[in-house]
Amino acid sequence: MTLAPVQPAGTTVEEAVLAVCRRAKVASRPLRLASRATKDAALHAIADAIEAATERIVTANGEDLARGAADGTSPHLLDRLRLDPQRVAAVAAAVREVAALPDPVGEVVRGSTLPNGLRLRQLRVPMGVLGVVYEARPNVTVDVAVLALKSGNAVVLRGGSAAQSSNTVLVEVVRGALESVGLPADAVTSIDEHGRDGVGALLTARGLVDLLVPRGGADLIQRVVREATVPVIETGVGNCHVYVDASADLAQAVEIVLNAKTSRPSVCNAAETVLVHSALAADFLPTLLRALHEAGVVLHADATSLAAARAAGLPAQPVTDEDWAAEFHGLEIAVGVVDSVQDAVEHIARWTSAHTEAVLATDVRVTDYFCAAVDSAVVAVNASTRFTDGGEFGLGAEVGISTQKLHARGPMGLAELTTTTWQVLGDGHVRV
């Protein structure tokens, strides 16, 4: 197995990171030409190698968990960091799912024959080299690597220091699997050892790295957007909203809100704000607040919701602007009462991170208006925000959920990791 090269003595962090990026650039060339069969063989080899290395992976992850617990990391964030044997098996299964997906490379996006007989084809081709910066999610190391490989790209990874032991082993396993099928190990590299200074060098590796994708909290994403000279796709801080309309199926609404908030409260597609129509304030709102409280959710309530909570004997605290803007990463939610779907949309427009918003209503006029008026990557109708996920969308794993409008939006699967090239097919054609 070829391990990622160690920084030579006397080499600066910037020089070391740029050297990694150059090796990735070289490795991207054979990947660009690799057949689907070769890439799929690599992914199956990676899945097999991950399963074979389960004990090593879990042991390394235990080191990360111990450090996190000693540092006071919250239980929800520790859960995101955790890799037990069952989760390792799930990671391997996800790799095989990506192998089974269609290869986007070579897909004809559109084509035509001009009046002069010249034939045009626009084809999907790999980006080249991806740089992905992410936090404390070791499964992302594998997800990103296999999506990059399947779409014909090399990738330079920078995972959070909280998961460094896990990521080191996972990258070693992936690199060894690549070599076993004749692909260059440098198609997947890591700059974790270089810390925050390494991130700075990666962000400015223009000409070597073709696309940067940050995955993590607002501070990380904004640093990448602010400092990068490499093109960036901004991914999702998830301040997701659920609006419960007067026409909603109320039993269904309680279940959806609970799922959106409590099933995995630390992830970016968890709901952070629920807005309830004022016609439901007297009867439904106390029921919803009680259900949230019984699920362990801390309530940040506007004046109407606060009064309803106190009348029902439930603890709640006054909501602040910081709460409306927050991605809580835990069992907390902001609650507000609005007079119409228009008011709900106005609230969302002010506070959203443009990730995912849901409307719960049976009135089609309400759902149609909400879908047309809300400007977010994903809009859900009578469904949980938790469905915003590459796997749930049938895209396989995802590199991230883009909340910007160029070049991709929403969950980023294989197609979103390609660009296009035009082929102009002639027979001695010259322009007159």
From Swiss-Prot:
It catalyses: L-glutamate 5-semialdehyde + phosphate + NADP(+) = L-glutamyl 5-phosphate + NADPH + H(+). GO terms for cellular component: cytoplasm. It is found in: Cytoplasm. Disulfide bonds: none annotated. Pathway: Amino-acid biosynthesis; L-proline biosynthesis; L-glutamate 5-semialdehyde from L-glutamate: step 2/2. GO terms for molecular function: glutamate-5-semialdehyde dehydrogenase activity; NADP binding. Its main location: cytoplasm. InterPro entries: Ald_DH/histidinol_DH, Ald_DH_C, Ald_DH_N, Aldehyde_DH_dom, Glu-5-SA_DH, GPR_dom. Belongs to the gamma-glutamyl phosphate reductase family. This is Gamma-glutamyl phosphate reductase.
